[in-house]
C-alpha cells in the first residue's frame, strides 16, 4: 500500500509525490524528502535555542540549520533515513556527493569552534540504529567517521510515522 499525492504545478517535472509506503514488517515508511527538515525545524523550536536559521551558508555548502544558544553557535545537517535492512537503518539509499561534502564542512566547522551535528531522521518505526551505507557509497562512511573523529555529534531522531504524518518522539546519540 502506498500514499501518493497529486501536486498540480507547472514548475514540476512530475504530477505526483510518493509520501509514504507501507512495509509489511515496519508499517508506514515516510518517503517525503522534505519532511525531515520540516519536523527537525519544529523539534528545534522546542529545544531552547535563542536563534534558529534554516538553510545557512557555511563555506561552500548550505547547512540545514544554524542555531545559537548564548554565545555558542551550532550547525546541524539533517538526513532522512528510509532504507531498512534486517531491522537496521542505512544512509544513504543512493549516492550523495552533497552529503559527503556536508560532512566535511561540519568537521571543519567543529574544528573552528561550532558545535556540529548530523541528525538522522528515522522515517519508519522500530528502527533505533543507523549505519552508513558503505555498499552504496563508501565515501559517506569515511566522511562520517572523520566527522565523528572531529567531534561532530551523530543524532538519531526516532519518529512516530503515520500514513501522512511524521513526528519526532525520541533523540538518541549515534
Task: State each model region's role.
Residues 87-97, 107-136, 158:
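Nucleic-acid nuclease catalytic cores
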Residues 63-93, 106:
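Conserved catalytic cores of phosphodiester-cleaving nucleases, focusing on short active-site segments
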Residues 123-174:
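Domain-level recognition of nuclease-like catalytic cores that cleave nucleotide substrates
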Residues 10-25, 168-169:
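OB-fold/S1-family single-stranded nucleic acid-binding modules
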Residues 1-11, 158-159:
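Flexible glycine-rich surface loops and low-complexity tracts that mediate binding to linear polymers
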Residues 25-54:
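Acidic-basic catalytic patches of nuclease active cores, encompassing PD-(D/E)XK
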Residues 1-4, 102, 107:
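Short nucleic-acid-contacting surface segments enriched for D/E, G, S/T with interspersed K/R
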Residues 1-3, 26, 117:
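Basic nucleic-acid-binding interfaces
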Amino acid at each position: 500500500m502506498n500514499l501518493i499525492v497529486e501536486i498540480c504545478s507547472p514548475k514540476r517535472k512530475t504530477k505526483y509525490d510518493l509520501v509514504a509506503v507501507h512495509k509489511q514488517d515496519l508499517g508506514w515508511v515516510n518517503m517525503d524528502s522534505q519532511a525531515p527538515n520540516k519536523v527537525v525545524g519544529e523539534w528545534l523550536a522546542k529545544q531552547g535555542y535563542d536563534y534558529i536559521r534554516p538553510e545557512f551558508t557555511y563555506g561552500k555548502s548550505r547547512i540545514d540549520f544554524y542555531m545559537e544558544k548564548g554565545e555558542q553557535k551550532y550547525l546541524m545537517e539533517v538526513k532522512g533515513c528510509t532504507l531498512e535492512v534486517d531491522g537496521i537503518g542505512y544512509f544513504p539509499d543512493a549516492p550523495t556527493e552533497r552529503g559527503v561534502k556536508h560532512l566535511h564542512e561540519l568537521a571543519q566547522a567543529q574544528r573552528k569552534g561550532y558545535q556540529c551535528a548530523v541528525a538522522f531522521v528515522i522515517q519508519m518505526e522500530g528502527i533505533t540504529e543507523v549505519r552508513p551505507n558503505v555498499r552504496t557509497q563508501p565515501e559517506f562512511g569515511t566522511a562520517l567517521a572523520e566527522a565523528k573523529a572531529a567531534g561532530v555529534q551523530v543524532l538519531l531522531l526516532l519518529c512516530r510515522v503515520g500514513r501522512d504524518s511524521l513526528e519526532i518522539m525520541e533523540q538518541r546519540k549515534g
